[in-house]
Regions:
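C-terminal motif of bacterial Sec signal peptides marking the signal peptidase cleavage site
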Residues: 18-22
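N-terminal active-site segment of His-dependent metallophosphoesterases
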Residues: 129-137, 144-145, 187-281
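Metal-dependent phosphoesterase/phosphodiesterase active-site architecture
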Residues: 129-138, 195-205, 209, 232, ...
């Protein structure tokens, strides 16, 4: 068994040094050659700044000590390094001080000849004695400052473990997903890359190769009281003037953030940040989404949930459909802790039946692997800890006034949904979902008949309202499918106490309903002389014609978009007289 060194990640500055350690300044490129040298170039190198790195020689084809090894960045900056010793089995290289952490292309130069060997990633570390168990394929340390952090949950999406007293973890991972992630412990934060919290790291070696993956935490105070800003479907695709409308949302969010600076704030999406169909036809994918949001929102870590439109429709299985999301955004399921709350992100979009076409034949389902991981994750969470769980598609669905069903009552989905609800028994759970472009709240009394226990669901509206169409056709008007305005949710946490509200884009936060005097509301075809002759359009408008004929019944229709059945409602007329109200289902 090999003896590996315990490693601490170091934060380094780029140093531009002269002499041997400087960038290559040759006026001409060396001739590319294939001189007889061969060695194993690992996908990742853990070392120290200016350290010695050893390489395994293949078939005795070692370099000479007079050769130079070059490490070249993606933007063309090269660093030359000397070979300190060599044999038929291995050789060692002294890294120049100008080399910093990152990706490099590696080549050897002999005189005027040069040979390329591929790419590697250099990570700087500090050594401490540690020997991984036999069979371990991933290990590392979770640290804060110069100390390891104990009891941090670490997972590869299949296996889950915790760090020991020195902050060390190890996993016998098959590296199926190609990453490991931590469940950020309460009282800590991770660094950010733009809006993305860096709680996971991509693995660089194959499943048989032992490698390191470290995490660095920062201690924070006052996390028991915080706000979570929750963003439903965005559907950015560079169409229907969506980017300009998205700027209206980010301006509203930034204004609210600026006026509510007390306490910690975080963000959370509910999926469908992008629109898979337009990845290819309009070239708008996750990098473009990240450019968009990073250019407009700063100082807010945003955790992400995956939606159906965040899967690649050209894939032919669930794993491949998620590839680009995992590469650019985050794992498809994971957890983290803030204050006294445990957050869980799940993926309930199963693309196993994708056929590589625009049919996008997905199912709303939780895979067994995901539920197995959830069981492990919750084994570290006390039953008294509230859970906030985000999925893209809804778990329940309104049937009528204060009545709900399991979403769609799709028989194929029942077993895993019911398994999920059984796993969650004993916890107080708040599901937060998107997908519908509507708003509804299901309370424990309404979900209990469906096999849930202490379970809420909050279907939380959307940023794009009706896929940006209302604002495109009528600038400044952002209306969702249920008449609710485009907006986002603001959740306030005080210990284990949770409050939530919906904030309409461009409106005061107290704007929570819209009222119509039905004496002055009616629809007829004469209102729209230029209506499309399409049967689909005609039939859709006909619903409103039949629902709202001219009348003088002195009725008021009130759309309270974030309603829940525990609310108390008082309606008065202009004289202060209280009016009787009846809950109804109607078009808005």
């Amino acid at each position: 068994m090999r003896n590996y060194k315990f490693i601490w990640v170091l934060v380094l500055s780029i140093l531009m040094l002269g002499g041997v350690n400087s960038c290559s300044s040759e006026n001409s490129e060396p001739e590319v050659d294939t001189f007889d040298v061969d060695f194993v170039l690992p996908a990742g190198i853990d070392t120290q700044k200016g350290g010695i790195v050893s390489f395994v020689v293949r078939d005795g084809k070692a370099p000479e000590t007079t050769d130079l090894m070059y490490f070249t960045t993606d933007d063309g900056i090269s660093r030359s390094c000397t070979i300190t010793e060599t044999s038929s089995a291995s050789f060692s290289v002294k890294l120049s001080n100008g080399i910093v952490e990152g990706d490099y292309s590696v080549s050897l130069k002999r005189g005027s000849r040069r040979k390329e060997f591929g790419k590697t990633h250099i990570t700087f570390v500090k050594q401490v004695e540690f020997t991984p168990d036999e069979g371990t394929t991933v290990w590392g340390v979770v640290s804060c400052g110069d100390k390891g952090v104990a009891n941090v949950v670490v997972s590869d999406g299949y296996l889950t473990t915790t760090t020991n007293t020195d902050g060390i973890y190890q996993l016998k991972s098959e590296k199926t997903w190609g990453y490991v992630f931590i469940s950020i412990p309460s009282g800590y934060e991770v660094s950010s890359k733009g809006v993305l919290p860096q709680f996971y790291t991509t693995l660089k070696s194959d499943a048989k190769t032992l490698e390191r993956a470290d995490f660095t935490l920062a201690k924070v105070e006052g996390q028991d009281n915080f706000r979570m800003y929750i963003f439903g479907d965005m559907h950015l695709a560079n169409r229907t003037n969506d980017k300009a409308q998205f700027k209206v949302f980010t301006n509203d969010l930034n204004k609210y953030l600026d006026s509510h600076k007390s306490g910690k704030s975080y963000g959370l999406t509910l999926g469908d940040m992008t629109w898979d169909l337009y990845w290819y036809s309009r070239g708008y994918e996750f990098p473009q989404y990240l450019d968009e949001i990073n250019s407009q929102v700063s100082g807010l870590q945003i955790f992400h949930t995956m939606g159906n439109h965040d899967n690649d429709f050209k894939a032919k299985n669930d794993f491949d459909a998620a590839f680009q999301y995992v590469r650019d955004i985050a794992p498809t399921y994971y957890s983290y802790n803030i204050g006294q709350i445990h957050f869980i992100v799940l993926d309930d979009i199963d693309c196993s039946d994708y056929d590589g076409t625009e049919s996008r034949n997905y199912e709303k389902n939780f895979t067994s692997d995901q539920l197995d991981w959830l069981l492990q994750d919750l084994s570290y969470v006390d039953k008294s800890t509230p859970l906030v769980i985000t999925t893209h598609a809804q778990i329940f669905y309104p049937k009528g006034n204060n009545s709900f069903a399991l979403d769609g009552q799709v028989i194929e989905r029942w077993p895993n949904t019911k398994k999920l609800l059984n796993i969650l028994k004993g916890y107080t759970v708040h599901f937060v979902t998107g997908h519908t472009h509507t708003i509804f709240n299901a309370l424990p009394s309404e979900t209990a008949p469906l096999g849930a226990e202490n379970v809420f669901e909050h279907n939380a509206g959307s940023i794009c309202a009706s896929w940006w169409w209302s604002g495109y056709l009528t600038p400044g008007v952002y209306v969702s499918l249920d008449g609710a305005p485009a907006g986002y949710s603001i959740w306030e946490f005080a210990g284990k106490d949770i409050k939530w509200k919906y904030k309409a884009v461009g409106m005061d936060e107290n704007y929570q309903f819209r009222a119509y005097d039905l004496n002055n509301v009616s629809f007829s075809y004469s209102d729209v002389p230029n209506i499309s002759t399409s049967t689909k359009v005609q039939n859709a408008f006909d619903y409103y014609v039949k629902a709202y004929p001219k009348n003088s019944n002195n009725e008021v229709l009130i759309n309270i978009w974030n309603w829940n059945s525990n609310w108390k409602l008082s309606v008065t007329d202009e004289t202060g007289k209280e009016l009787k109200w009846t809950q109804t289902v109607a078009y808005d």
